[in-house]
Amino acid sequence: MKFRLILIICTIFCGVNQVLCQALPPVNPQLLKSAWPAFWITSPANQQREYGVYHFRKTFLLPAAGKPKSFLIHVSADNRYRLFINGKAISSGPARGDLFNWFFETIDIAPYLTEGENILAALVWNMGSLAPVAQVSNQTAFVVQGNSAAEQMVNTDVSWKVKKSKAYTPCALDNGERLKAYMVVGPGDQVDGKLYPWDWETLEYNDASWNAAEELTHPQPVGYGTDNLWTLAPRNIPLLKESILRFPVIRRTNSIKVNKDFLTGKRPLTIPANQRVSILLDQQSMTAAYPELIVSGGKGSRIKMTYSEALFDKQDNKGNRNEIDAKEIKGNYDIFIPDGEGNRKFRPLWFRAYRYLQLDIMTTDDPLILNDIYGMKTGYPLKMNASFSSNDPSLQEIWKVGWHTAQLCAGDMYYDTPYYEQLQYTGDSRIQALISLYTSGDDRLMRKAILDFYHSRTPEGLTQGRYPSNRLQIIPTFSLFWVSMIHDYWMHRHDDAFVKQFLPAIHETLEWFHNRVDQKKKMLGPLTWWNFVDWDNFNDWGTAPGAEQGNSSIITLQYAYTLNQAAELFRAFNHPAQADYQELLALELNAHTYWYCYNEANGLIADTPERQTYSQHAGIWAILSGAVTLQEGQTLMKKILNDKSIGQVTFFYRFYLTQALKKAEMGDLYYKELRPWRDMLKMGLTTFAEKPEPTRSDCHAWSASPDYDFLATICGIMPGTPGFKTVLIKPSLGELTEVTGTMPIPAGKVSVILKRNGKEGIRAEILLPEQTTGIFTWKGKEVKLHEGKQIISI
């Protein structure tokens, strides 16, 4: 075997239901190339970088001639805002970015205006040092800019009024400590109703005592200005949606009886004076929503709302998520203290992720009436435009739960987990983006993620491991996944200008690794930063063996895999010398890694040349990088599937296990590899977890990969050429006998109906969009496909 070592001389490169998800209106081009007439404004005499919640108001007159057909405004804030017109909430934002790309929303407020006097109001908050890690910030600020001269009357300046809220204080500051987990989504909200300026967003409110806003500076768009505090860019994703979501069931109460009609909003619940009660609500599936609680009376009462993915037993185990006996809630929470008046609505500043919500209520001398409680479900407006079914109905539940997981992990960026972090990691985002492409056909969040990571690059050339983020974290392996993500986009979308802009950054990323190649062994030497691979089986940080000491086969082979993808990109964009260099380097890395790490005795690829540890991960990358032949890859795959003594992949890396199965022409085994998802369903999970039990997060979209693989692996629908210009259909049915699938591609929809014909044959009914061709392949036989409907029997 060791004669496979190839010595290569490499050449050097020379070269509410508020429908907030409509299409975004156009921006006046002048505002994208010069300073805005409006000002960034703030509240005077306040610490601008500390925690604070602010109310901004502006009254303005419309002429009696009638309402305008359009009234476009551009809005942004630091940290965030919620915008009201004449008392109605119409928008929130901005989409998260960084100071170099601070996003603004463009909103047509004409439908909400009336002749005569109108009120434009905004709730703006800055979490200061308590902000989520995903929140970048400069200081508290707010801006509104009219799109044209007709809308300039609402521009932010000293004519706006502002009041700092005394009602808000942060709470739930010890979430991470109580949950014994990394949790960085920001604090909960404690709101004192007697200090809240109720109806402040309406025209009738008297703001005579409010301060005039303080002008900071004129906003500047990307590419312009000097001394910029924020550099503004148009929002590049749709506005997030909101829709009402009611609780279906009360699971437990303490010291009170609750009629089921309370949950429908038809029957208020009265909590007597001087009582302590608790009510456990079960959404019956994970959700991301703004809980809204409407109360009357109960002056001085204390209402604590605790949110959790699951309940915990005394050993802090979750167990079956449907079971609540001998378990208690533990998690993020908010507190509301009513002022005693009627129909007071509490809503937290930011959404909460939960399955269970517990109300712990303490009343004083005044009875408290709970008029209603529900959630306003929110998230990116992903729409299901694909379908999958088979003769195994259990796969439908996996498909359904995977889609739900993907939805909850999509907001103004991809979230790793909506409960614990709400951070966009490259390793997660690659899988999430493919799910989005295959199930919805929507590529906008994928494009934003690629750009976000592009903007995160460090002077060394690596992308940050998660971004946007106010804390530096670099995961070199995730920088490689960023390159893979661009390659994915290139294969699935025809957008040369978008892809081409990243080539210099791709080169810099890959050169960071090239500069760290051990010149003796021709494998990667010692690597800095956090070289995360997978959570289990390595160490507490999921770091690959050999990453810090040098000669990690896993990362070396992933680097080779990425070099081959980059070579395809550079060759496609007329950089043949660079492509040749990348291919030769990949070949050299593969050959030397195989030489040093292949163990003839057990037929496995070791994690390092010392051959002390072995993992599925090393074998996976050996197959994907081309370090082994097809026959060798099949032998290797059988060993890593059957040898339970070696490091096993978790849910994240099962995506790559499946990719390796397909490359080894063993995709039919995928169906048997679905047991981990079946096990999660048996545990009562309504979304897919971060890793096998015990898991921190119950909702992690890197574990939703079956929603991609049911279409790309079982149905076998893949791009045949870049841009999905042609289609390759290569089914891997496994033990299934019938499969139906439909998915969107740029040209339209691809549909397949597949039925086994005897033991080895297949009958395929395939529908391709107009002007689309492809190839159908089954057990080594190929049939050319044309546009329209065709029936194939093999």
Positions of predicted regions on the chain:
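Bacterial Sec-dependent N-terminal signal peptides
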Residues: M1-P26
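Active-site acid/base region of carbohydrate-active enzymes
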Residues: N155-C171, Y356, T364-V401, Q407, ...
